[in-house]
Amino acid sequence: MSPRKTYILKLYVAGNTPNSMRALKTLRNILETEFKGVYALKVIDVLKNPQLAEEDKILATPTLSKILPPPVRRIIGDLSDRERVLIGLDLLYDELVDNDLNSSLMDALGVPDIEEADS
């Protein structure tokens, strides 16, 4: 089994508004559930650090950026839909591809599926 990738993410928020806090809470829940121990999240308050928002061309908050692994992906706005966040950042796709690769490798090696082994 290959080592899991490390995910680097940035969440841009505008102060401690309810929308910002909800985005952060939802995102942390997703990351702790799906990527525990293999992610780094940097929260950037664009009101306190407008230069960082300008450098990264952030025009709206909340904005979530996946920096690593490439390609860079962004989601702007509502982060409450877990599947939308994972698909939008190519995180769900990465997990599906890893599972498909494992399945293809097992097929190539002639290892039967669990259902076949029981019959």
From Swiss-Prot:
Gene Ontology biological process terms in this record: circadian rhythm
InterPro entries in alphabetical order: Circ_KaiB (IPR013474), KaiB-like (IPR039022), KaiB_domain (IPR011649), Thioredoxin-like_sf (IPR036249)
Domain of life (superkingdom): Bacteria
Pfam families attached to this UniProt entry: KaiB
Keywords of the record: Biological rhythms
Gene3D superfamilies reported in the protein's UniProt record: Glutaredoxin
UniProt comment concerning the protein's domains: Has 2 forms, fold switches to a thioredoxin-like fold (KaiB(fs)) when bound to KaiC.
NCBIfam families: circ_KaiB, PRK09301.1
Listed HAMAP family: KaiB
The protein's assembly and partners: The KaiABC complex composition changes during the circadian cycle to control KaiC phosphorylation. Complexes KaiC(6), KaiA(2-4):KaiC(6), KaiB(6):KaiC(6) and KaiC(6):KaiB(6):KaiA(12) are among the most important forms, many form cooperatively. Undergoes a major conformational rearrangment; in the free state forms homotetramers as a dimer of dimers. When bound to the CI domain of KaiC switches to a monomeric thioredoxin-fold (KaiB(fs)). KaiB(fs) binds CikA, leading it to dephosphorylate phospho-RpaA.
Protein family membership: Belongs to the KaiB family.
Function: Key component of the KaiABC oscillator complex, which constitutes the main circadian regulator in cyanobacteria. Complex composition changes during the circadian cycle to control KaiC phosphorylation. KaiA stimulates KaiC autophosphorylation, while KaiB sequesters KaiA, leading to KaiC autodephosphorylation. Phospho-Ser-431 KaiC accumulation triggers binding of KaiB to form the KaiB(6):KaiC(6) complex, leading to changes in output regulators CikA and SasA. KaiB switches to a thioredoxin-like fold (KaiB(fs)) when bound to KaiC.
Name the UniProt record assigns to this protein: Circadian clock oscillator protein KaiB
Organism classification: Bacteria, Bacillati, Cyanobacteriota, Cyanophyceae, Synechococcales
